[in-house]
């Protein structure tokens, strides 16, 4: 694999992690508003 492939894999991984973190924070905010 060349550097571009490695970079792409890293970007894809961090993108998925970021999406998960955003989903979790949104869910937590929704839970707070429900109380």
From Swiss-Prot:
Q: Which GO terms describe its molecular function?
A: ATP binding; phosphoribulokinase activity
Q: Which UniProt keywords apply?
A: ATP-binding, Calvin cycle, Chloroplast, Kinase, Nucleotide-binding, Photosynthesis, Plastid, Transferase
- EC number from the UniProt entry: 2.7.1.19
Where is it located?
A: Plastid, Chloroplast
The yes or no answer to whether the keyword Ribonucleoprotein is present is no
According to the record, the signal peptide region is none
Any single biological process term in GO: reductive pentose-phosphate cycle
Q: How is the enzymatic or functional activity of this protein modulated?
A: Light regulated via thioredoxin by reversible oxidation/reduction of sulfhydryl/disulfide groups.
Give the pathway: Carbohydrate biosynthesis; Calvin cycle
Name of the molecule in the record? Phosphoribulokinase
């Amino acid at each position: 694999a060349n550097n571009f492939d490695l970079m792409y894999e890293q970007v894809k991984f961090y993108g998925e992690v970021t999406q998960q973190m955003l989903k979790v924070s949104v869910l937590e905010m929704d839970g707070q508003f429900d109380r």
